[in-house]
């Protein structure tokens, strides 16, 4: 994952009196990730796919809030699971291409 870092080691000639150039006292690593998809908004609620759907935003204050996960169809369109579940109660097709909906992946 991470490459090995080059470390300066004192040579034999400077071993006694050499000082370190610097010393790392603290290091706070920061990382960011994102889904590798072309469309990054849920076409149903219009929220960013990485953000909470409107249903989860409304229930955010309650202690029983679930994870807001992403659902992928075989057509490779992604929606919040809550949004597509609510959509599928009335129509069994993808909201974007009108093909019959079938789950390909579900979750993070």
UniProtKB/Swiss-Prot annotation:
One of its GO terms (biological process) is SCF-dependent proteasomal ubiquitin-dependent protein catabolic process. Induction: During hyperosmotic stress and thermal stress. It is found in: Cytoplasm; Nucleus. One of its GO terms (molecular function) is ubiquitin-protein transferase activity. Zn(2+) 3 binds at residues 75, 77, 94, 97. It comes from the Eukaryota. E3 ubiquitin ligase component of multiple cullin-RING-based E3 ubiquitin-protein ligase (CRLs) complexes which mediate the ubiquitination and subsequent proteasomal degradation of target proteins, including proteins involved in cell cycle progression, signal transduction, transcription and transcription-coupled nucleotide excision repair. CRLs complexes and ARIH1 collaborate in tandem to mediate ubiquitination of target proteins, ARIH1 mediating addition of the first ubiquitin on CRLs targets. This is E3 ubiquitin-protein ligase RBX1. It comes from Salmo salar. The gene is rbx1.
């Amino acid at each position: 994952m991470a490459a090995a870092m080059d470390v300066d080691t004192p040579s034999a000639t400077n071993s006694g009196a050499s000082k370190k150039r610097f010393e790392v006292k603290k290091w706070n690593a920061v990382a960011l990730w994102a889904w590798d998809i072309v469309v990054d908004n849920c076409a149903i609620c219009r929220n960013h796919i990485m953000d909470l759907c409107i249903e989860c935003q409304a229930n955010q204050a309650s202690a029983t809030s679930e994870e807001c996960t992403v659902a992928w169809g075989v057509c490779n369109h992604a929606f919040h699971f809550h949004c597509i579940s609510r959509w599928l109660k009335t129509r069994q097709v993808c909201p974007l291409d009108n093909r019959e909906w079938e789950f390909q992946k579900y979750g993070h």
